[in-house]
Regions:
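Terminal presequence/propeptide segments associated with secretion/organelle targeting
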Residues: 1-814
Length: 814
């Protein structure tokens, strides 16, 4: 793999750094090509400039989490990724009865902008070291479980106390910068009125689909425009916004980006890397593949999709293959060099409450599961690619060699490494139990009904504790977020798919891993919920008169497979067929719960309606709750023990590296990374240039059309609208499409603005190529590359293809 320009300039040390480190890094950034002072970038300090670039950055998505966005106008216009906005587009489509996801959307007037559901923007206003408060409150505890809970509670209490003193509905969070050593408080301004402005059609915003995902060359229009509004219904006026550079950036140019990358584990011991490679990642991949298969089957059934056409039946090449033109009117072409005419005084409509979703007939499944399906497909390819790269670069062997060197220099490291190996051995031994429980509690896009029941039952148990000792998601300050998340999942239930997920959870779970006893949990009693009061005894809910249980029938039932008979009159064999699972789904009262009802039940479980208490899915959760609680406590203790050991190990390493700057692992907070627009060589005799064009997109579509005619169904994802193809062929082939650069990114950097040396917007980050998937564990500038949508593609699509002259003018306004 060829050396990168940034590797030559700085070795391999320049990674992704907390925004607060900008001043310390400024000398090196300037040497690379940065032309801005540090104060013009970092606006999070106590005396920071409100116009600093960091104040143009937002964390955007459901409840403020999902990806990165940035203000690109003084009127609250936000650019983010198509896939970050996808869930908002999907929800808006269901409410309006118009498929914005397939057809795209453009608001030519602000009155046409569409309200999103649950989407918020969070702006990082301040960050502050609160290590003393957290470590002092928790650091003396020796018991692993109590210690882990003490650190959790101290961080959450610090955030809660500080939030109470903030004005205007601000949100505070405390994150571990160096676990058990350094903690940082982040203060966010929350904007809860976010509206759709522009979304390209799916055939462009997701061009290439899963085939092109994490690959180069790439030609995807993965961007969208939103607008934030204030409480007064007027467009939000940010203290800073990015200027757009209409000429983009060229090969070799210095670039940097800001964003909210998720989590890295770059200081992980070899034992953790082995566990990821052999246990955790393979398990996730199996789970994701299974769920994707179930989703595909549900889609085929819902849409009556025919098998791919045989070659003999192929229709004319491009005409049949090109996606149908979006139903919106053909827009007027716009010359990007001409300033839009002055508009009349705009109106600022108040945010209207979301309208109820119209009944969907055909295609309803696709809109309901689009975001979940894309997320699972993305995570499956990312996880499998990450595992492949772990092996390809030999990271486990490399880390073992580093650990041997550390032990030679600091013998005290040996017992720490041995104890860490024991932690991961235990995590491996209990992995089957966790897998079963995750299925039964609906995580990772599993059953929404099981997920809702799990949260409600957990709330009933946790309600006996003081608020400051409950699970974080069940504390008062978080209940709005929890209720919104659950309500969204329940609203998206597509009954046939939900039944398949329920069946998979109930028949695919490893009961032996949950219960060491010869027979499985008493799920027959759980399902016979209409005739029992055991649950009220457990959670302190009021009892009601019940019929006696036929103990003889119960004992006979325990001998049947899965012990899931007696389910609302089912025949022996229980919930072992899709029809039986569908019966459970159709009868469940949880499906009808909305956000307000869920919020009330989570806050006061003892007032939960009897029909919810007695729901069959509540019974399932009750049956697996004891092992769930035991697993949660043991896993938390193991992770807490790991954090203590890793902190001590890093103390030894940093003591040996005195004077060398160290960057902490990513934790979802605002960060900066820098690099160059540059290609790379992935393997022998292959060199990748750093830019693609619209002409390359057309060529790829033409090639895919031939493959589609030959029966390749996946080629459907390479079908742009016919009018788009005509426009590109008419003179736009050389317009840049996507761009490659050597910044350090990972999940959470979706939507990060790529900025030139002067801090101007030149691209929007949306992906990495396959070798860069190992970034979670290691960044290497020789082969780690990120992919962005070139600003010239954005301007061409918004202006020329969709004729939104006012939006282009707004983006180019200084």
């Amino acid at each position: 793999m060829a050396a990168s320009k940034i590797a030559s300039a700085m070795g391999s040390r320049f990674r992704t750094w907390p925004i607060g480190e900008t001043a310390a890094l400024h000398g090196e950034l300037a040497a690379l090509g940065l032309k801005l002072p540090a104060a013009a970038i970092d606006g999070t300090g106590p005396d920071a400039d409100a116009s600093a670039l960091s104040n143009a950055l937002v964390s955007v998505g459901a409840s403020g989490r999902g990806g990165t966005g940035s203000f690109i106008s003084k009127s609250g216009l936000i650019v983010t990724n198509h896939h970050v906005a996808l869930d908002a587009v999907r929800s808006a489509s269901r409410r309006a009865g118009v498929d914005y996801l397939e057809d795209g959307f453009v608001a030519k007037r602000r009155a046409d902008e569409v309200a999103t559901e649950s989407y918020e923007c969070w702006i990082t206003r301040r960050c502050e070291d609160v290590s003393a408060a957290v470590v002092e409150a928790a650091g003396a505890e020796a018991d692993p479980l109590k210690r882990a809970l003490a650190f959790r509670d101290a961080a959450l209490k610090t955030a809660k106390d500080r939030e109470a003193g903030e004005a205007g509905g601000a949100r505070c969070e405390v994150k571990a910068t160096w676990p058990e050593r350094t903690y940082t408080l982040f203060v966010y301004e929350r904007l809860s009125d976010v509206r759709l402005v522009y979304v390209p059609p799916r055939s462009l915003g997701n061009f290439g689909g899963d085939v092109d995902n994490f690959e180069w060359p790439r030609h995807t229009a993965d961007f969208a425009l939103l607008r934030a509004y204030g409480a007064d219904g007027r467009p939000y006026a940010p203290s800073a916004h990015l200027r757009t550079a209409p000429d983009g950036a060229d090969a070799g140019d210095f670039v940097f980006l800001l964003g909210f990358p998720g989590r890295t584990t770059r200081y992980a011991p070899a034992s953790r890397l082995k566990y990821a490679e052999t246990v955790a990642v393979p398990s996730l991949c199996r789970d994701f593949r299974r769920k994707l298969d179930l989703m595909e089957r549900a889609l085929d059934e819902d849409e009556g999709r025919a098998p791919p056409p045989a070659p003999a039946a192929a229709a004319p090449r491009i005409a049949s293959y090109a996606a149908a033109e979006p139903r919106r009117a053909v827009p007027k072409m716009v010359d990007l060099g001409v300033t839009a005419k002055t508009r009349g005084k705009p109106t600022y409509p108040k945010k209207a409450p979301p309208a109820p979703a119209p009944p969907a007939a055909g295609g309803g499944c696709r809109l309901k599961i689009a975001a979940a399906k894309k997320s699972l497909a993305n995570e499956l390819k990312r996880s499998s690619g990450k595992r492949a790269m772990l092996r390809r670069v030999g990271l486990v062997a490399e880390r073992e060699a580093e650990e041997q060197a550390l032990v030679a220099a600091a013998p005290a490291a040996r017992p720490l490494l041995d104890e860490l190996a024991a932690v991961y051995a235990r995590l491996e031994a209990t992995a089957g139990r966790r897998d079963a429980l995750e299925k039964l509690t609906g995580v990772y896009h599993g059953s929404a009904l099981l997920a809702a029941a799990s949260a409600l039952y957990d709330a009933a148990i946790e309600s006996a504790k003081p608020d400051d000792a409950r699970e974080a998601y069940l504390r008062e300050r978080n209940l709005d977020f929890t209720a919104a998340r659950l309500a969204k999942r329940l609203d998206d239930v597509h009954a046939p798919l939900e039944a398949a997920l329920v069946l998979d959870a109930l028949t695919g779970s490893n009961w032996a891993a949950l219960y060491p006893a010869p027979r499985a949990p008493n799920l027959d009693l759980a399902f016979n919920a209409d005739r029992r009061d055991v649950r009220r005894d457990v959670v302190g809910l009021p009892t009601v008169p019940v019929d006696p249980v036929d103990e003889g029938a119960v004992e006979a039932a325990l001998a049947l497979p899965m012990h899931l008979n007696m389910v609302h009159g089912m025949t022996p064999g229980g919930c072992e067929t899709l029809e039986a699972a569908r019966s459970l789904v159709d009868k469940s009262k949880l499906r009808k719960l909305g956000k307000d009802e869920l919020r009330a039940m989570l806050a006061a479980p003892k007032d939960m309606a009897w029909e919810v208490q007695s729901d069959v899915f509540m019974g399932v959760i009750e049956s697996c709750y004891p092992p769930f609680l035991a697993d949660r406590d043991e896993t938390r203790a193991l992770v807490g023990r790991r954090d203590r050991l890793c902190a001590e190990l890093l103390d030894l390493q940093r003591g040996l590296d005195a004077g060398e700057p160290a960057y902490p692992d990513c934790n979802g907070s605002l960060r900066l990374s820098a690099g160059f627009v540059e290609g790379y060589s992935p393997c022998d005799a292959v060199v990748h240039a750093p830019r693609t064009t619209l002409g390359g997109l057309v060529d790829k579509a033409d090639d895919a059309a031939s493959r589609y005619e030959a029966g390749d169904a996946r080629a459907r994802d390479f079908a742009p609208p016919a009018r788009f193809l005509d426009l590109v062929r008419g003179g736009a082939r050389d317009t840049p499409a996507n761009v490659l650069y050597s910044t350090d990114t990972l999940g959470g950097n979706s939507g990060s603005p790529v900025l030139d040396a002067a801090g101007r917007f030149v691209a929007i980050n949306f992906d990495r190529q396959r070798p860069g998937l190992v970034n979670e564990y290691k960044y290497d500038p020789r082969y780690s590359r990120s992919i962005g949508v070139d600003v010239r593609m954005i301007l061409w699509l918004v202006g020329t293809y969709d004729g939104a002259a006012d939006l282009v003018a707004e983006m180019l306004e200084a």
